């Protein structure tokens, strides 16, 4: 049986976002499930936009998610190989030189659209005579090169979409070599997939038409194409998610919001599938349940609050030994198991535990809260004597009700605000024993 080899091929032209991290996760999980290999390739042929800082950030995000690669390379290191294939395809007459300027191509595109026609290249340069080509060269025009798509049916069996069919006539001959000599994604990707024995490729459905063209590229190079799976796009309300939209970067989720690695991995590897989205605690367990056939063809809606809820579920499911190691990473190793168990049921992110430590150990500022001072002083006088325990809250509130007649929100909200300066959070019954008795009285009487 052929060894499964998958790849993830980001362009280092921006930060990883939730759309392409999903592709990275699924390719890694597919390889892991089938005891295969996972290759990280950087598509850095866009010399103007590719930056080392983005490459470093992509690697950092992948390592954070425990997506480890067996091999990595960048396309700029393989230019001589691409050049050799360019010459081969020129000999086979599957590449041809074109001399239109970007402005001329844009005018053609606008004209076609104005006539209600698809913007397909008209092949004006396909049959240029030597004399015509010489004229363009004398005008100091540098050629770009297009791949000649045969006008014949194209089909393949997609792991997610099933049978996919295209008519070659409906596809535009793509530019594969720019006028400055740099290569575009289309042909380089095929050459890499052949040379690195890629067997399976999982990517977004915005690549489906690219795949149709690349099928002919594989054929032109006498190679059987990999098996493809095209994921439905992730959308946020009415807009598909991409690096150009912004606001959905993995770096933002982990650094600014504080989402756990396994929450991100669990959520985006199950989003859009028929499987229940659960907070898995390891990539191995996630790989064991992974089934590419479970993914839907329909667009997938991403709502950040769903990810935050999953993050909460993951946090409260962790044992303290695991949490202890994570607390060191956020410089909160001073937090003990009792404190964690008391506040964790209401944490959204791990870093929230530091906020609650400060709330319990530093008098909060309540000056702007307009609290009922007389009621709070009365409540302070009714605080049960002796050690404060989890039972103290129910004893205390019963006594307050008996004396003041207050119940429900009218009773507990002023107490919560005076003690924590927050309208919500862990149950006060759990928080109360974490605050010194003298501090409780101080907060109630000085509010």
Swiss-Prot record:
| HAMAP family registered for this protein in UniProt | Glu_tRNA_synth_type1
Q: Where is this motif: 'KMSKS' region?
A: 240-244
| Organism name | Rickettsia conorii (strain ATCC VR-613 / Malish 7)
Q: Name one Pfam family in it.
A: Anticodon_2
Official protein name in the record: Glutamate--tRNA ligase 1
PANTHER family with a match to the protein in the record: GLUTAMATE--TRNA LIGASE (PTHR43311), GLUTAMATE--TRNA LIGASE, MITOCHONDRIAL-RELATED (PTHR43311:SF2)
Any one GO BP annotation for this protein: glutamyl-tRNA aminoacylation
> Is Membrane one of the keywords?
no
The residues that hold ATP are 243
Q: What this chain does, per the record?
A: Catalyzes the attachment of glutamate to tRNA(Glu) in a two-step reaction: glutamate is first activated by ATP to form Glu-AMP and then transferred to the acceptor end of tRNA(Glu).
